[in-house]
Regions:
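Bacterial N-terminal signal peptides
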Residues: 4-14
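Structured loop/turn residues at beta-strand edges in well-structured enzyme cores
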Residues: 10, 77, 112
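Intrinsically disordered, low-complexity
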Residues: 15-62, 138-163
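Short linear capping/connector segments at secondary-structure termini
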Residues: 36-37, 66-71, 100-105
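...with weaker cross-activation on analogous glycine-rich loops/strands in unrelated enzymes
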Residues: 49-52, 84, 88-163
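Active-site nucleophile-His-acid catalytic modules used for acyl/amide transfer and hydrolysis
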Residues: 56-76
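Active-site nucleophilic cysteine motif
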Residues: 71-90
Length: 163
C-alpha cells in the first residue's frame, strides 16, 4: 500500500503547477502600470517593447470567445487570442494558438522578460513583470494589464526562447 501511494505523488505534483503569480517591482526591469496601460522599462529589449505595445492596443477591449484567432486585430479577444497577439508582435509566434498548445510552447520555466502560464482551458502572460490576462475572479473580463496576484494551479510555466 505504501508503494502504491508513492506512485501517485508525481501525478499530484503536476496538478499544483508553478507558484502563484505575485507582482514584484524590480526597478529598471519591471514595466509600470498607469491608467490601464503598461510602460516598458528602459532596459526592455525590442521584442518586449513590441509585446507591450500590442497589449496596450488591445487592453480594455471586450472578452470574445475565439477573438484574436481569425484576425490578429479584432474587436474582442479570448485568453489565447490575446496571448497570441502579444507573442506575434514580439516576433515569437506565427498565427494564433489555443490555450492548451501553449503548454508545450517555447522553453520550460519562467522567462527573463516574458512568462506564459498555460492550462488546457486558459493562458495568461507576464510581460516585464506585469500580468496580461483576460480576467480572473469577479473583475472585468477582456484583455488587460494587472498587478493583482492570481493562482496558477494546473498551469505549465513556459517562455519564448531568449526572452
Amino acid at each position: 500500500m505504501k508503494f502504491r501511494a508513492l506512485l501517485f505523488i508525481p501525478l499530484l505534483a503536476g496538478c499544483v503547477g508553478p507558484a502563484p503569480y505575485v507582482y514584484r517591482h524590480v526597478p529598471g526591469k519591471t514595466a509600470i502600470l498607469r491608467d490601464g496601460y503598461a510602460i516598458a522599462p528602459p532596459a526592455a529589449p525590442e521584442p518586449v517593447r513590441a509585446a507591450i505595445a500590442a497589449g496596450n492596443r488591445i487592453a480594455g477591449l471586450p472578452y470574445a470567445w475565439g477573438g484574436g484567432h481569425a484576425h490578429s486585430i479584432d474587436r474582442g479577444y479570448d485568453c489565447s487570442g490575446a496571448a497570441s497577439c502579444l507573442l506575434q508582435a514580439a516576433g515569437c509566434l506565427n498565427g494564433a494558438m489555443p490555450s492548451k498548445s501553449f503548454r508545450s510552447y517555447g522553453e520550460s520555466g519562467p522567462g527573463e522578460w516574458i512568462s506564459i502560464y498555460a492550462r488546457r482551458d486558459h493562458v495568461f502572460l507576464v510581460v516585464a513583470g506585469l500580468r496580461f490576462d483576460t480576467g480572473w475572479g469577479h473583475g472585468p473580463r477582456g484583455p488587460q494589464w494587472s498587478t493583482k496576484s492570481r493562482p496558477t494551479n494546473g498551469s505549465a510555466l513556459r517562455h519564448p526562447t531568449g526572452l
